[in-house]
């Protein structure tokens, strides 16, 4: 009986919840975006079922994305945000995440106002790639909506990291489920802060 229940129960996950009355995503929930919502719902569900990344990182990056989506003031902004989220979900589905540690920046127990998603990839026994995206206002021009971080290092030197994108030097302090990132350089503070590990 229990096996039959699981086989007959459809699994459904919505990328955008349009069921709540008076919600702040009315434009996105309009009929004109139904195809994009369906596509995003399918990608979201697929990423939850297929990826080897922790499902919590997919759910929390989804919550962060919805926060950015709510800031959109134009149809173009909404379209861009949907496309960007589809790209992010495709990465979760298509790339091996088993050797990747995901971190989100937190402040006072919640997502940081300046949202940052950092990934630490173990490329080989002696090579680590660290990449991050700091999200900015989604109403900015597409090329000004985020700031990238990219660094390559080794396991022995993963506490002293230089961002190749902006030549910023950081001190990384890893402790269990927390990553503390510090810098003394002016203009490099965007990626400094406390990050929570998703595993």
Specify the residue positions occupied by each region the protein language model found.
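Tryptophan-anchored aromatic micro-motifs
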Residues: 21, 94-117, 195-198
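N-terminal glycine/threonine-rich, aromatic-flanked beta-hairpin/loop signature
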Residues: 112-150
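Amphipathic, heptad-repeat alpha-helical segments
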Residues: 17-59
